Amino acid sequence: MSRVGNKIINVPEGVTVDIAADNTVTVTGPKGTLVRQFSPVITIKQEENVITVARSTEQKTHKQLHGTTRALLANMIEGVHVGFKKELEIVGIGYRGQMKGNTLVLNIGYSHPVEIEGEEGVTIETPSNTKIVVSGISKERVGQVAAQIREVRKPEPYKGKGIKYVDERIIRKEGKTAGK
């Protein structure tokens, strides 16, 4: 059984955490500010540079919220301090992506270019025609934008063409063999 909720969270230098009475947590750091409201069942305490998360009862839902709250808080602190980044790769002949202002334009085998608008708080870059870098301070939003980009053309199992994460392994299938 996981004990994620019982682990303490260390607050690095340059990051400030403000906990309001209604369990709204504001985390400010060199990269920006994140605000989130947590369940009143969970108590969040800060003592100097250490944050602890505790639950009021041993109910199953409270145990689940305990671990989730701790993980979300740790991600908020890491995001404003270091930030998050997801890298995608475009595989396929003639497939490419480029930025036009705040819009990512993908030419990936459809009869029309696919345009994806950038979100507030998330930066999309194209260091080359076949590489896309999504970065920001919110792990959730960075992952969501990267997933939306990948969803436009998922990698197919026969040739591996499509948009994939850099560290993703595509399970390949063998094509049909010709009959006699």
Each PLM stretch: what is its role?
Residues 2-147, 151-180:
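N-terminal intrinsically disordered, cationic/polar leader segments
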